[in-house]
A protein has these predicted regions:
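Phosphate/pyrophosphate-binding catalytic cores of soluble transferases and nucleic-acid-acting enzymes
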Residues: 1-177
Length: 177
């Protein structure tokens, strides 16, 4: 509601930064704006992709950059809203240039995770990449699997990629509310 109010008052457009609301299938689960709210102000990056497709923070950054540029070109103020800190950080601090991981490797890691469960998978990850200890919780299935697939494919710790390769942040005057 605040975003809609700001969009009307400041001649703006709303751009989604919630990692669940980008998915078509999560309309109800993610409190996506209603049709009546969407009519009140232009909304972008809601229901963008199917959950069946891989969509990373880097993918979101590419999309949001296009939408911000388009909004500014149309003399509109981009108003970025949502709940994913990682997405906001990609805009303000940049994102690590981690090489793409092929779908076969991702599937292999997911299958291993499903077979072993949280704790045993985490223990296996620590053998593969000891640097991860105390940096990623065993219960964080998304990050543990990402760390595993990155180490498996690149032979380099996810933490090394994160520490050494930040780029692509947006150099705009950003106000946070």
């Amino acid at each position: 509601k605040l975003a809609i109010h700001l969009a009307k008052k400041l001649n703006g457009e709303i751009i989604n930064a919630d990692s669940m609301q980008v998915y078509k299938e999560f309309r109800i689960l993610s409190s996506r704006p209603s049709n009546s709210e969407i009519k009140k102000a232009k909304h972008h990056l809601y229901g963008l992709i199917s959950v069946k497709k891989y969509f990373s923070a880097g993918d979101w950054l590419k999309e949001v950059k296009k939408k911000i540029k388009l909004s500014l070109k149309n003399k509109k103020l981009p108003i970025i809203v949502g709940g994913t800190g990682l997405y906001f950080n990609t805009i303000t601090k940049g994102i690590s240039k981690i090489p793409d991981i092929d779908s076969r490797t991702r599937a292999k890691v997911r299958n291993l995770f499903n077979k072993l469960g949280y704790q045993k998978f985490y223990e296996k990850l620590l053998i593969l990449d000891p640097k991860i200890k105390n940096k990623i919780l065993p219960s964080d299935s998304q990050r543990t699997q990402r760390a595993y697939e990155v180490k498996l494919k690149t032979k380099k710790s996810l933490l090394d990629w994160i520490a050494n390769t930040k780029s692509d942040f947006l150099d705009y005057d950003i106000k946070k509310i």
